[in-house]
Amino acid sequence: MKESFGRLMIDIEGAALSSNDIELIENPHVGGLILFERNFVSKNQLIDLCAQIKSVKKNILVSIDQEGGRVQRLRQEFTNLPSMQTLGDIAEKTKNFSLLNDVGWLMASELIATGIDISFAPVIDVDRQTSSIIGCRSFSEIPEKVSKFAHEFINGMNKAGMQATGKHFPGHGSIEEDSHLTLPIDNRSLAQLMDHDLIPYFDLKDALSAIMCAHILFPKIDKTNAGFSPHWIQEILKKKIGFKGVIFSDDLSMKGASGFSYTDRVRISLDAGCDMVLICNNREGAIEAIKYMENNNISTSGSIASMMPKKKLSWKELEASNERNRIIKILQNIEEN
């Protein structure tokens, strides 16, 4: 029988669980927890925190954003990872595309050894050098290169036992605005997106285990924010593209998702086709979401179980690994040059 997970992902404030955190995690509707820099003091502390979380609830997906470059929540005692743009440029210049595989493996291995199940990675937005929020987080400005480089990175993650999440569907690379602060608007047509931003989603639909939806409005395609849109999620992502994996909302506390109560944000996201919704940095919003789920008998999800790591690894084993030491030396040479 497939394990069931609650469909809400929340955050915690500190470096250890509070009694309030434990009470929330124990709720059957909470099936995920996302970590931030504030939750990290040291590697051993983080290992203990992840173990504490799993002792409260076995069926909980522990996540983080450990992309590399400027979006890397864990730095001290973890390998400093280059941005995906830097990584793609080096791989292209040297024709050493296995480097992408290596870094995907290393990132995933360090997290799994710590007790973290997934990094929300890779970013498969196509960089058009207009986005304040994407930029160097993207592998390339060429869609086919994004697909090629991301596939190598995903293979590395999978080799370590971690499932990959592509983001931010349908594409954030052409947007100037930051959806954390406002609802970005993209006036391109679906045909234009099919020829550009959506190419990696078609190419990687079978390689990705999950996709995270963006809070962006495409008024020429649908009047609803893509993250809330059945047209985008059901008709385009699932039917037209053929994606069959897990679908995450982006953070519902972002300004790009505002204009509704948290109850409505959760309801609309789930109705649109999201398997799991994220509410970060707003405990009142998370509690409101739980009450909505309780009052409406929202079912748990069996599909989330597919995101759990397929391998186990300890830091002792990882630090003794010739593979890790080899990759770290390569990355050190990149930093020096």
Label every PLM stretch briefly.
Residues 1-62, 70-78, 337:
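N-terminal hydrophobic targeting/anchoring segments and the immediately downstream early-domain regions
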Residues 10, 38-53, 72, 151-158, ...:
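Second-shell residues forming the walls of enzyme active-site clefts
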Residues 12-27, 99-110, 195-201, 261-268:
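Short, acidic/polar
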Residues 41-48, 91-109, 141-149, 191-195:
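Glycine-rich anion/phosphate-binding loops
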Residues 54-82, 100-126, 154-170:
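Glycine-rich, aromatic-flanked loop segments that form ligand/cofactor-binding clefts
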Residues 78-94, 140:
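A charged helix-plus-loop insertion that forms the helical arch/lid used to bind
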Residues 118-141, 164, 169-186:
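Short glycine/serine-rich loop/turn segments
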Residues 298-301, 308-337:
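A short C-terminal boundary segment appended to hydrolase-like catalytic domains
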